[in-house]
Amino acid sequence: MIKSLNERDNFLNRLREMEHKREKDEKQEKAARKVQKFWRGHRVQHNQRLLFRAEFDAVSDRQRGLEETIKMAQLLVNFYETNKDEERLVMTLSELVKLKTSDKEFEKRIRETQRLLLARCCIKFLKNATENTIFFHIFRYLEDYVTCHSKLFEASSKLGLFNAEFHLLEALIGKPTGKTVERASLNPRILQLLTRIFETFVNPSRSTSVSVNVANRLLKTICVNITDLNFSNYILYYIKDHIKPTSPNFTNLFEAMKSVDILNNWKVRPEIAETASLRLQSIFVSQIVHVSNTQSEDVKQYFNSLAVFLEHHSKIMRSLNVKEDLSEFGRLRTSVNNHLKQYCEEMLISNEFRRAACIYANLPGVQVETIISLRKYFSQFLDLLAASNTFVEALYAFIARLCPNGEFDPIDAKSPKVNALELFCNCLNKRVSSVADSDFVPTDIFVDFDHTVEFLRDVSIKLIHLMFPTMARGDLYSGNLKEKMYKAETDWKDVTESVFSILGAIYQKDIRLKYFPEEFWTNHGREVLSGIGEHRRMPRRRMPNGRLQIERTMDTEFVERLAAIYEMDSDSENDDEDEDNNLPAVLRRAICVMKHIPFIVPFMDRVKLFTRLLNQDKEKHYTSTFGMGFNGPSVTVRRDQVYMDAFETFAPKMQGDKVNDLKSMVRVKMVNWAGMNESGIDGGGIFREFLSELLKTAFNVERGFFTFTESKLLYPNPTAPFLLGVDCLAHFQFIGRMIGKLIYERQLQEVRFAEFFIAQIFETDKNKDVDLQHMKSFDPIIFKHLKALQKMNNRELDELQLDFSVVTSDMGLVRNVNLKPNGSKFRVTVENVHEYVRLYVNYHLKQRIASMVDAVRKGISEIISIEWMRMFAPHELQIMIAGYEEVFTAKELRKFCELRFAAGTQDINYEEMFWDVIDKLSNDDKKALLKFVTGCSRAPVDGFKSIQPRMGVLVIPSSDDELPTSATCMNMLRIPKYSNRTKLEEKLRYAINSGAGFELA
């Protein structure tokens, strides 16, 4: 059984082997027949070539006429071989060119198929060319018989005409001797060849209509087959110099560049695709040098195409995954590619691009999408864009069309409408900042200025909500909450900051010009600090030590975080980023508003917030001082020497400086003119009077610290250093401390500062120029002259003989001061008159008082953070220091003042008589009354309701001979119950205007 099975297997194996052998023999036989067939064909062709060649030679040896030349052309295409028949080809082509030259109609005797076959011979010839090859007759034939016909040109391009031509070019250029990537000079032979290759694009007299397909093949040859250095050093610059939008066939070449699909149509490897893309981009952007000299439609077409083209190739570059090639060839290619990238960037920031961009931006029907796509390059000369009414109006129309209500979706962060909004704000900002206050005409800035600013104001709030979105409940427990919050903030940051910037610029101008209605900036219908309340609790989080944070209210967290942000240096704003990310969105929004656009919050809301900041600081100071048993400092001053006695105590000193005491409750003891201590214990009222009298003395222009503008506004006296000597800055620093204490205690002082002075005190940017508009309050005549200067022509300015220097006289010391280095050597002309005006204003309103302003600023900052004042505009800071100039009415005072009778029985008639007397007091008497009762002549900024303790009037039974008295620490007026109205009015006026100390108390 087993034996039979083995025999069966052996039999089957033998059958398989025989089958394999038979198949192998059949394949070998077929291969042999194929080789024999090929060999027989080759022998036949070889013999035929020999016969044709012999016949060709016989014909060519005879007298060559028209028929002989045609016969030679017919024979040549049948036997032509490289390295054997080059001379025969050149001879034939030479004869054909001669005949065409002598007889234009001869061309028709040569069939198109015959011409194309000869063109194929030319292509073979060129592919085998060397640097010594004579190419004249080849190109003459191609020009006269092939490329002059569109159909033949396209057919020959399919056969590899461009590859052959550029092979010859590279043979002429030779192997590079170095690796330098730079423009090379073209010798006459190379220039001639390039001109012949590109003849259909550079020679109008010999141009043939070139299809997009032919142009595509030309571009592929240039971008894929040419060696790196030959393209970057020769071909690129030839194309840049010689091919222009006005050149023949440029339209189809341009269309080919736009429509090229490198990855799908050219089908090249990723590393080749990268190089091809960069070469194509460099050719495309090279046209920038010619665009500005073309027709408007050409400019429009170029820029509209450029935006799409660059975006398309940017996607290609991002999609490629090119591995680094560290070979010598790879390093050279990388170097050339980097050069091409730099070349493209340089072209897109060149003066030529700037000129063309200016033309494009001013064309009617400009495509906003194009400039948005190219905003990286257009933004480099934003002044040109901003100057184009056509573009800016089109940009705003684009925004209004896509988001009429200023609504954006979270996914819109990178959308064209958001980019348009950012660009629009930057353009508008450029316009606003370039216009002096005195030349400000809203409709010149933008045709619909008022509505536009209102739109941006409302959009700013919506953008803040997109920067700090309320996360869904599911996100709160996911692991990527911080990433989502960070992404939202990053995505919307640029456009939001642009909106903030333009709103800030317009607001600063509005502060000075009072253009918008008083409530405009806060009339947005949004509660921007919503959710910040005493009773809303912050979510507790775990501290680094593992313990849970103490429960805090949203309001407390907001105030503390805001104080920390104001104190933070600009370069450390993100030090606490992780902690910020843990804040609720509503808190982050509120902080963002107060940090960037506080002016959209109503003034009184900011006053309340500022009070919270002060109270928090006082609480901290109280904890660190009184908590250790410190009861606050006391000072004794003479009533007629309040300023000097206070200066002796609180002036800046190297040792024993008592500046920190000013953050505590200072108790004052007054000594009267007779040298006796005044009665009364300071519960706050005496200090208020002390501070008021001290500052009144400091601001008295007769003391020399300050002087008046023409509008009777105070600013530091430029001659103070000459009057006060070495102690000058110490006095101003001391005055700054007292102003800081005034603000710290929320006390008011009757004083009107020049806005340019108060703005410099609280300005965070020390390099900011003072606007010419401030000169109007400083000296209207000088303001008028400076305005006139800006409108003069060169002849008028030359007659004035002005230079960049001014003459000053300080206490009899006459000096000539240069407004800039060697200023006396520079004449004022039309070109620099604006610079002269700017420097002149800065010198008089800033430079002359700079050291004193810095001293005042330093003094204030020792008591209260200057940064806290950023939430207020200069005119609001004036209110914070001096209150409102309007005098209170009896009705306002009565609402928050309690009147009682010591006897316990109310006398309605007497009460009404008292309030009627108050109502009839003059404004000066009302101020005197308020100072008599509270120690301050101005009502609080936020009204009498904020006075603590509450104001009161106590009517006591007494005789008509007694005078009213007050307890300023209690804000209480004690008034006898006089027998009649006349007596009441007489005694009250006498008491409040007596100027007495606390002897009446």
Swiss-Prot record:
SMART domains: HECTc. Pfam families: HECT (PF00632). It catalyses: S-ubiquitinyl-[E2 ubiquitin-conjugating enzyme]-L-cysteine + [acceptor protein]-L-lysine = [E2 ubiquitin-conjugating enzyme]-L-cysteine + N(6)-ubiquitinyl-[acceptor protein]-L-lysine. Residues 28-57 form the IQ domain. The active site is at 969 (glycyl thioester intermediate). Residues 658-1001 form the HECT domain. One of its GO terms (molecular function) is ubiquitin protein ligase activity. One of its GO terms (biological process) is meiotic cell cycle. Keywords: Coiled coil, Meiosis, Transferase, Ubl conjugation pathway. Its EC number is 2.3.2.26. It comes from the Eukaryota. Residues 66-115 form a coiled coil. Disruption phenotype: RNAi-mediated knockdown causes a reduction in progeny viability. ify-1 and cyb-1 accumulate in the cytoplasm during meiosis II. Also extents the length of meiosis II and causes retention of rec-8, a component of the cohesin complex, at sister chromatid cohesion. Causes a delay in oocyte budding. Signal peptide: none annotated. Interacts with ify-1 and cyb-1. This is E3 ubiquitin-protein ligase etc-1. It comes from Caenorhabditis elegans.
